Swiss-Prot record:
It comes from Homo sapiens (Human). Its main location: nucleus. GO terms for molecular function: DNA binding; DNA-binding transcription activator activity, RNA polymerase II-specific. This is Putative homeobox protein Meis3-like 1. Residues 12-65 form the MEIS N-terminal domain. Belongs to the TALE/MEIS homeobox family. Keywords: DNA-binding, Homeobox, Nucleus. SUPFAM superfamilies: Homeodomain-like (SSF46689). The keyword Mitochondrion does not apply. Residues 108-167, 228-248 are annotated as: Disordered. Residues 161-223 bind DNA. InterPro entries: HD, Homeodomain-like_sf, KN_HD, PKNOX/Meis_N, TALE_homeobox. It comes from the Eukaryota. SMART domains: HOX.
Length: 274
């Protein structure tokens, strides 16, 4: 069987196409009708050759599918592509609005801000609006509204940004800190207690859970380690005395520890576990 039937070209053409495939089928049918011997004495070899020709034909057709668009692009590169590039700005008049929508969606999902908030008097939010619009960078190029609506929107978004960055309101921090010092014997709130704390603080359950994880590592564990090293001071009163000594930026708040917790006070007013 002639292998040229597998990759025959169209008669008078340079590129293989479906027309050549039909012509090959016609030539093969004529060969069958003429009863010319195209099979050998080895059936396995004949079957292998037929399958190989079919596979090669499939690959040749797939290559042709990928080659035809490339030829068209090369032919029209000097003319059509340049015209399309010149018409691009006119066909996309709402590109800045689309960039603004993209930025707002990513801000709501907690992504990193690429632009700085614009001033209330109006102006571009990015450092160079012209460069960002020419290069297509995803910076916020919208002009701030001169009315008070833009200021109100910025004020509404500020608490959400603070929560996403892990900066909780002082009121919420004081509530969770009070619960922590009131439950020093077991500083692990249950799911119901987490829900109640989230409702009282205005935070999410995940934020409350993360705060207690950090508090047990930054507050409780250092006190336990220090008490193990020092062990100085008188024993804590079973009735429970005001506890102080750990403050960050919040006002000092005194709490009473449960009677089951062994504590000690040193001369500097710091309290520790026994």
């Amino acid at each position: 069987m002639g292998p040229e039937l597998g990759w025959g070209h169209p008669r008078g053409g340079d590129v293989c196409s479906s027309d050549s495939f039909n012509e090959d089928n016609t030539a093969f049918a004529k060969q069958v009708r003429s009863e010319r011997p195209f099979f050998s004495s080895n059936p396995e070899l004949d079957n292998l050759m037929i399958q190989a020709i079919q596979v090669l034909r499939f690959h040749l057709l797939e290559l042709e599918k990928g080659k035809m668009p490339i030829d068209l692009v090369i032919e029209d590169r000097d003319g059509g592509c340049r015209e399309d590039f010149e018409d691009y700005p006119a066909s996309c008049p709402s590109l800045p609005d689309q960039n603004n929508i993209w930025i707002r969606d990513h801000e709501d999902s907690g992504s990193v801000h690429l632009g700085t908030p614009g001033p209330s008097s109006g102006g571009l939010a990015s450092q160079s609006g012209d460069n960002s619009s020419d290069q297509g960078v995803g910076l916020d190029t919208s002009v701030a509204s001169p009315s008070s609506g833009g200021e109100d929107e910025d004020l509404d978004q500020e608490p959400r940004r603070n929560k996403k960055r892990g900066i909780f309101p002082k009121v919420a921090t004081n509530i969770m800190r009070a619960w922590l010092f009131q439950h020093l014997s077991h500083p692990y709130p249950s799911e119901e207690q987490k829900k109640q704390l989230a409702q009282d603080t205005g935070l999410t359950i995940l934020q409350v859970n993360n705060w207690f994880i950090n508090a047990r590592r930054r507050i409780v564990q250092p006190m336990i380690d220090q008490s193990n090293r020092t062990g100085q001071g008188a024993a804590f009163s079973p009735e429970g005395q005001p506890i102080g000594g750990y403050t960050e930026t919040e006002p000092h708040v005194a709490f009473r520890a449960p009677a089951s917790v062994g504590m000690s006070l040193n001369s500097e007013g710091e309290w520790h576990y026994l």
